[in-house]
Swiss-Prot record:
This is Peptidyl-tRNA hydrolase. The gene is pth. The active site is at H19 (proton acceptor). Its EC number is 3.1.1.29. TRNA binds at Y14, Y64, N66, N112.
Length: 191
């Protein structure tokens, strides 16, 4: 069994913001795989199903971003999975809008949700899929930027990224993270 966790903030005011792209990815995975996100437990909204021939739990922690580790820890403990059996999906301002980066370990890179998960797990060795949301303009505050919605011109890149995340998760579950990294960690070149 695997647990796939998308990071974001609960409540309507944060829907469709850059920081909630992890929640959007979980919604896309649920839709693509006929999984109902209809259970509230372990400080998360969850759904059970199958992806890539593996049993999965999809989860959207409801603790607010900076406390995501509380929910992740509860999920891991309850379902008795190892840190190698989780995938965390979240926003990354260091990547171009829509670019994916899959990693199996690494620092939080300034992301407070990941920092909290690392603290609760006592390890940075877990699979994560970063979705590029672009760097903030010089005159923007970081919090205002990540809590802003995507402008219309970026929406096609985000839709495409969510489609790729769905395929990347299936690849990780079926073939492993290394194969997925080779397939999806490519920067698109516009010619």
């Amino acid at each position: 069994m695997y647990i796939i966790i998308g990071l974001g903030n609960p409540t309507r005011e944060y829907e469709a913001t850059r920081h909630n792209i992890g929640f959007d990815a979980i919604t896309r995975l649920a839709d693509d795989n006929n999984i109902s996100l209809d259970t509230k437990k372990h400080k998360a909204i969850c759904g059970k199903g199958m992806i890539g021939g593996e049993k999965v739990i999809l989860a959207k922690p409801q603790t607010y971003m900076n406390l995501s580790g509380e929910s992740v820890r509860e999920l891991i403990d309850f379902y008795k999975v190892t840190k190698e059996e989780i995938i965390v999906i979240y926003d990354d301002i260091s990547l171009d809008v829509g670019q994916l980066r899959i990693r199996t370990k690494g620092s939080a890179g300034g992301h407070n949700g990941i920092k909290n998960i690392i603290a609760h797990l006592g390890s940075d060795e877990f699979c994560r899929i970063k979705i590029g949301v672009g760097d903030k303009p010089k005159n923007w505050d970081l919090a205002d930027y990540v809590l802003a919605r995507f402008p219309k011109e970026e929406e096609p890149a985000i839709r495409e990224a969510l489609e790729k995340v769905s395929k990347a998760c299936e690849t990780i579950l079926r073939d492993g993270a290394k194969v997925a990294m080779n397939l999806f960690n490519k920067k698109e070149i516009n010619t």
